[in-house]
């Protein structure tokens, strides 16, 4: 670990914050077109107050996914039930929902609790009320023992199960995001933070009086690469989020920027200007061996790995303006991908490798866009302003990005089809440079 100058104080710590969301998610568009679902409050089978209501987490997750719209609790024809035996199909005949989530929580000794839940096919119950046994209505049912500290985590797990069973797509509710918070009035205004995807369980990894930027997750979700100016110059670090051990990977003169892990987690694609113009390089994290990828008089920057690890998506000005290109590592062959709009930059690749997400500038407006790599159809997803830094959820359904709202930098989210939109404001300061973790 590098010895810092006397003028600098950098705080490295994992500092768990109070149990509240540091980033509040405000849904702004798309809930009306979501699929209706019913989540019955889980039944508490103990004495005294329940530690936490898991069903609140499930309802919030499903609403924030943009795919589902949980029904209001007061509109449900049955409440206080937790098993199929208590489910009255006839009472739900007119309920506009495709499934019902219900469950129970009971003490299991010490600080442990037994949580049970069932996912009921309401469409089948309504269409064929007498043609099958009651058990045929159960899409999934599970029970597990957890501690009080695991209530939110297990709520996310239930949401993952519900989402995958009803959509066929793996849920991404047990994921995290990394981002940079800036409070200009503080002595050390820059903080590298991580939190659950919904803003809860926020932790600070690094605090510095100098800028921090461009966090990027390793494929195993255990490390972050980022750029720090803590030594009054740009340097790239890799830090283990659990042990706090970190390594200085590059510290060349000039630009050291835009780090992103390779799919195997052994290398970083980075932007360096050590040889003149900003170019894209690949750095072996263990050996520090460097391979130059691009060699052009124009600026090449912002690399992102395709899932096979054989090529990179980059932003290049070799055509006169920033556009997205694909460069193959073995051959060096490079091809331009984007042509619409004035600029296209800051690209990310969907987990399936079939589409790219990026910042598009048209008529002077910066918005998040998506392009299908086979058809080359481009769709602008957002209508906010000064959008930047898109990062895709590991299941490919949502994009988190930086934008400006009421004069402040905030985070926002949009579904991959552009239908659902949400804003993630923070209580104090500004937030930027989001990065969505892999599945954890």
Curated annotation (Swiss-Prot):
It holds the Pfam family TolB_N. The keyword Cell division applies. Its main location: periplasm. Keywords: Cell cycle, Cell division, Periplasm, Signal. SUPFAM superfamilies: TolB, N-terminal domain (SSF52964), Tricorn protease N-terminal domain (SSF69304). Residues 1-21 form the signal peptide. It comes from the Bacteria. One of its GO terms (biological process) is protein import. GO terms for cellular component: periplasmic space. It is found in: Periplasm. InterPro entries: 6-blade_b-propeller_TolB-like, PD40, Tol-Pal_TolB, TolB_N. Belongs to the TolB family. Part of the Tol-Pal system, which plays a role in outer membrane invagination during cell division and is important for maintaining outer membrane integrity. The Tol-Pal system is composed of five core proteins: the inner membrane proteins TolA, TolQ and TolR, the periplasmic protein TolB and the outer membrane protein Pal. They form a network linking the inner and outer membranes and the peptidoglycan layer. This is Tol-Pal system protein TolB.
